[in-house]
Amino acid sequence: MIRTRHVFLFAVLLAFASSQTPTPEAKSSEQSLEENKFFPLPPTTPFPTNAVAATDEDGEELCTSDKTIIEKLLNNYKSFRTPSESGVIVWIEVWVQEVNSVNEITSDFDMDIYVTELWMDSALRYEHLNPCKYNLSLNSEILDQIWKPNTVFINSKSANIHKSPFKNVFLMIYPNGTVWVNYRVQVKGPCSMDFSAFPMDQQSCHLTLESFSYNNQEVDMQWMNWTTPLSLLKKEIVLPDFVMSNYSTSLKHEIYPAGVWNELTMTFVFSRRYGWYIFQAYIPTYLTIFISWISFCLGPKMIPARTMLGVNSLLALTFQFGNIMRNLPRVSYVKALDVWMLVCLTFVFCSLLELAIIGSMGARSENRQAQQQKQQDEEATKHQKGRENSTCSHLMSPSSCPNSPRICRNHIPNDVPQSFKSYGSTDPRMRKRLIIASSSTISHAPNANRSEKVLLLDGLEETQFSQVETKFSSMASIKMKKHWTTEEIDRLSMIMFPGLFTLFNIIYWTYYLTVNT
């Protein structure tokens, strides 16, 4: 009986000694805990513990329940005291769940995000209490009873923790005192709107996190450095008007009168999806411009039809421009769409200006033709009256003619050369024949007495003046031939307008499609 008792006591002592001897796994666990005392592990890494559950006489493990651990941790806990006198490091991570909207009118964006905070609180260590679990998952009621870094979105317009159906706050405490807090927040932040390249623009939106109550001497806020501090829960975030093209994080130190604060900034870049504007603005303006060029093919006689095409094109462009611009904020600088519309309006206006030039030239040409026709009719009438009033005979002597040789131009004797007989003719074509005659011909005219010579010399004076007048008229006709006709201007416009518009398109699309990249 006594021997049996000694064997039992030896077994108990052996079991106790083996339980107190640390295994290699336990040693590594202790070393891991010491290494992560101030730099917590990622939340996905299970926190080991060196606590070994004791057993009762029946062989059942004895561990401390979560309720008991919480009661002991919160007993005499001071929530207003920072976890460390030398300051605490708070690690931040953000997961983007969804972007709800990007508003150009109010210059902001709305999104749902998960905000993760990690810090060490030595007052919440419970590994020595032999816990039944390696972590404690608690609700927001316990979070209100412990110390928090009071993280805020310092530049947000609004921020609310989701309540669907309860407050979306997650709290986990690890045995080494690591506190992991996660919020699901709907936040509205500002955007730096720049519409210079609209609708090929990119907009940048920012959210800044910082501790509202503690400067960086007490709370040193940092982005998580062992994982991606900012990530998307979706592969791609696409909105009706925008797509998230880039996102990044940054850290800067902001100086306030109360000290220096660490500001953690998230930057989101949204690129506009301009397909809607291609179909609603650019393609209709292309068609309007092409329609305005049809007037060049109608000819200078179709002034009313060409005017209708030009005016309707101008009104259509103005309506399209106003319909698109009314949904955008009023800015004082020129946008890419403004450049497009103004240039298109300029092309349509220039087509109307070309039409005005064609119409003016056509009207002047018609007036000139009417005056020439009227002048020809008057000359024909005078010629007819001169024939009827001619009463002198071609065979009369010179003495029977009047004293003034200008009145008796048709009364030249038959022996005068034929080139001089036409002097008195009112036909302009016949009058030009006097240019052939010279003074020597006149002086040697047969049977020409003094009166006849006076008559012919008088005719020579008018012939010389007529020759000078004919030279000037021929020079004027040469100059008139150098002027553009309406048909030539239309043909030139059919080449210049499409060519200049094509050049503008190359410059426009090359610049605005590459300005953001």
Curated annotation (Swiss-Prot):
Pfam families, A to Z: Neur_chan_LBD, Neur_chan_memb
Disulphide-bonded residues: 191-205
Signal sequence residues: 1-19
Topology in membrane: Multi-pass membrane protein
Predominant cellular place of this UniProt entry's protein: membrane
Gene Ontology MF annotations: chloride channel activity; extracellular ligand-gated monoatomic ion channel activity; transmembrane signaling receptor activity
The keyword Ion transport is assigned to this record: yes
One of the GO BP terms on file: chloride transmembrane transport
Subunit structure: Does not form a functional homopentameric ion channel. Forms a functional heteropentameric ion channel composed of acc-1 and acc-3. May interact with acc-2; the interaction does not result in significant heteropentameric ion channel activity.
Designated name of the protein: Acetylcholine-gated chloride channel subunit acc-3
Organism field: Caenorhabditis elegans
Gene: acc-3
